[in-house]
Amino acid sequence: MSYRGRGGGYNNNRGQFSSGPHQHQQNVDSFVAANQYPIEIMGWNGASSGECINFISRKCKVIVSNYSVDSNSGVLKGYVKNESQANTLLNWSGVKFAGQSLRFSKGVSNISNQMGGGASTGSQSTIETISQFLKARYQPEIKMLNLSNVKQDPTLTAQGFFGSLSVSSKFFPALMKVASDLKLDVDSIDLSNNELQDLQTLTSMAQTFPKLQNLSLQNNNFTKIKVFETWRHKLNFLRELILFNNPIVQTNDPAEIQTIKLELMKSFPRLVVLSGEILRNEQVLIANLSFPFESPETMFFQDEDSRNLATNFIANYLKLWDANRSELMILYQNESQFSMQVDSSHPHLIESGNSGYSGSTDFGYYLNNSRNLTRVSSIKARMAKLSIGQEQIYKSFQQLPKTRHDIIATPELFSMEVYKFPTLNGIMITLHGSFDEVAQPEVDGSASSAPSGPRGGSRYHSGPKHKRIPLSKKSFDRTFVVIPGPNGSMIVASDTLLIRPYTSDFPWKVQKLPSNPTAATPGVSATSTPSPLPPTTITTPQLAPPGTGPTTADLPADIKARLNQIQQELLVKILLETKLNINYGIMLCEQSNWDYQQASVNFKNSAASLPSDAFVQ
């Protein structure tokens, strides 16, 4: 039998591999060249950059490689294979991700290119032109930036900034980047008369001016309230918003008007004035949003015994956690439980002050074992991610990066609360702070989840190797339930670790709100505007001490059928203290995960924005 047709005979592969390293380099060059079409992504801040890239790969069937976050603009930048893939992503603009709408654009390497090249044909560069424009429009005496009617600005028009639709759409992102570099002190911005239909091009404004207090968007083309989701919980100091002469407010339906007000108050927690109308009591609002202690302490202990136990425990625990986690296993027993979850759902400021770390936060080492119950719905998956007993717990510890906690050198960066836990005759310790990742895990659990086979990489190992995940600073919250053991020892009955993006803004720091928020209305044009409705003041109900009222026996049968006894008792307690009706009471409990302390906090934060029919009349 001849094998001539199958392999060409002995040593017939000599010609195929004769080029050696030269051929290999050509392959590398070809791969690099094929993955160098830039793409930019906005509206991704509801989660981590890695989660966004994975979502795009699953949903859009396009792989974005070599991605990074621009620390100035917050834009997520990466590369796709060719222009065709870039066009595919452009067609996906508007797809929902982590509660926001993603927006794709063909990327660039600098602002001059971003403006399409045509914007720098004059003697001034693009950056210089935008800088001069900003300086001319900035009024430092009242801290106001006038960005109204930018398309009619003669300097910008002469430089070709609005010569095409693609260039026009990139103007505001470029402007915000330059404004960030100039570090303008801005309280008010006027964006009137700009033909705006949505806020996609203004996503980065929240990062550039996070403490903005007054904003005018009058004489634009906003038609839907959901466009403001782009800025939800990002402009947390916005006090006044002007929306005159927008289709969204040109309605006479009282229910629709009330819905608009409520949605805007949810998006901007300190919003007081909407188009001249007072929405809520500002003094009550400031009181509810202010930290209740004049000099907040980083540590709280229920008594002296709790202090002694907790401080010794935490100091020794973190020392071993950073040095040798195997020595911690003596603290865990067969019934001990450990779980870890990642919370990347809250937008966070991109901090560039961490030398030695990458600009973006990657949770790759944590996601595989994350037990975030808002994302893991399967009972089987939830149980699989709960470690019980020494063996499973140590295995979970090995899959987490090695760390360094500087609690001895910088105790002010940590906070701790300690309460007695009478159910088990122990104490509950909750520790908040941050840590440095200093080395990869002993066991890389993220690699085990890599797909294989025809749909997930080559089954013959010809695909790309597992990418090493960059290390970075991260913030955390960790709760221990510690009980006494034999011979004076201590046992960790429960250990819950929450990992979140790093921030240097700690809630136990003193953060004073402006005592006299400026009430100046940002740049209203001379055109006539409709007179505002008579102002109304919404008083905020306060938590009241429980008194005589309903009991669990008084709850409707259908409510009792779907709630356990503990939930029924909590619901009754909440109804008595908040005076909410039963529907809003259940909603509050569910959104607080049936936690009394969290429900109290959530009620105080949102009571001012609740309609009057939410309360028992």
From Swiss-Prot:
<comment type="similarity">
    <text>Belongs to the NXF family.</text>
</comment>
<feature type="repeat" description="LRR 1">
    <location>
        <begin position="185"/>
        <end position="206"/>
    </location>
</feature>
<protein>
    <recommendedName>
        <fullName>mRNA export factor MEX67</fullName>
    </recommendedName>
</protein>
<keyword id="KW-0677">Repeat</keyword>
<dbReference type="InterPro" id="IPR030217">
    <property type="entry name" value="NXF_fam"/>
</dbReference>
<keyword id="KW-0963">Cytoplasm</keyword>
<dbReference type="GO" id="GO:0030623">
    <property type="term" value="F:U5 snRNA binding"/>
</dbReference>
<dbReference type="InterPro" id="IPR032710">
    <property type="entry name" value="NTF2-like_dom_sf"/>
</dbReference>
<dbReference type="GO" id="GO:0005737">
    <property type="term" value="C:cytoplasm"/>
</dbReference>
<feature type="region of interest" description="Disordered">
    <location>
        <begin position="1"/>
        <end position="24"/>
    </location>
</feature>
<dbReference type="GO" id="GO:0017070">
    <property type="term" value="F:U6 snRNA binding"/>
</dbReference>
<dbReference type="GO" id="GO:0015288">
    <property type="term" value="F:porin activity"/>
</dbReference>
<feature type="domain" description="TAP-C">
    <location>
        <begin position="565"/>
        <end position="617"/>
    </location>
</feature>
<dbReference type="InterPro" id="IPR002075">
    <property type="entry name" value="NTF2_dom"/>
</dbReference>
<dbReference type="InterPro" id="IPR032675">
    <property type="entry name" value="LRR_dom_sf"/>
</dbReference>
<dbReference type="GO" id="GO:0000049">
    <property type="term" value="F:tRNA binding"/>
</dbReference>
<dbReference type="GO" id="GO:0016973">
    <property type="term" value="P:poly(A)+ mRNA export from nucleus"/>
</dbReference>
<dbReference type="GO" id="GO:0071528">
    <property type="term" value="P:tRNA re-export from nucleus"/>
</dbReference>
<feature type="compositionally biased region" description="Gly residues">
    <location>
        <begin position="1"/>
        <end position="10"/>
    </location>
</feature>
<keyword id="KW-0433">Leucine-rich repeat</keyword>
<feature type="compositionally biased region" description="Low complexity">
    <location>
        <begin position="526"/>
        <end position="542"/>
    </location>
</feature>
<dbReference type="Pfam" id="PF18444">
    <property type="entry name" value="RRM_9"/>
</dbReference>
<dbReference type="GO" id="GO:0005634">
    <property type="term" value="C:nucleus"/>
</dbReference>
<dbReference type="GO" id="GO:0042272">
    <property type="term" value="C:nuclear RNA export factor complex"/>
</dbReference>
<comment type="function">
    <text>Involved in the export of mRNA from the nucleus to the cytoplasm.</text>
</comment>
<feature type="domain" description="NTF2">
    <location>
        <begin position="309"/>
        <end position="499"/>
    </location>
</feature>
<dbReference type="GO" id="GO:0030619">
    <property type="term" value="F:U1 snRNA binding"/>
</dbReference>
<feature type="compositionally biased region" description="Low complexity">
    <location>
        <begin position="445"/>
        <end position="459"/>
    </location>
</feature>
<feature type="region of interest" description="Disordered">
    <location>
        <begin position="442"/>
        <end position="469"/>
    </location>
</feature>
<dbReference type="Pfam" id="PF03943">
    <property type="entry name" value="TAP_C"/>
</dbReference>
<dbReference type="Pfam" id="PF22602">
    <property type="entry name" value="NXF_NTF2"/>
</dbReference>
<dbReference type="GO" id="GO:0030620">
    <property type="term" value="F:U2 snRNA binding"/>
</dbReference>
<dbReference type="GO" id="GO:0000056">
    <property type="term" value="P:ribosomal small subunit export from nucleus"/>
</dbReference>
<keyword id="KW-0509">mRNA transport</keyword>
<dbReference type="InterPro" id="IPR018222">
    <property type="entry name" value="Nuclear_transport_factor_2_euk"/>
</dbReference>
<dbReference type="GO" id="GO:0005643">
    <property type="term" value="C:nuclear pore"/>
</dbReference>
<dbReference type="GO" id="GO:0003723">
    <property type="term" value="F:RNA binding"/>
</dbReference>
<comment type="subunit">
    <text>Interacts with nucleoporin complex protein MTR2.</text>
</comment>
<keyword id="KW-0539">Nucleus</keyword>
<dbReference type="Pfam" id="PF24048">
    <property type="entry name" value="LRR_NXF1-5"/>
</dbReference>
<dbReference type="InterPro" id="IPR009060">
    <property type="entry name" value="UBA-like_sf"/>
</dbReference>
<feature type="repeat" description="LRR 2">
    <location>
        <begin position="211"/>
        <end position="232"/>
    </location>
</feature>
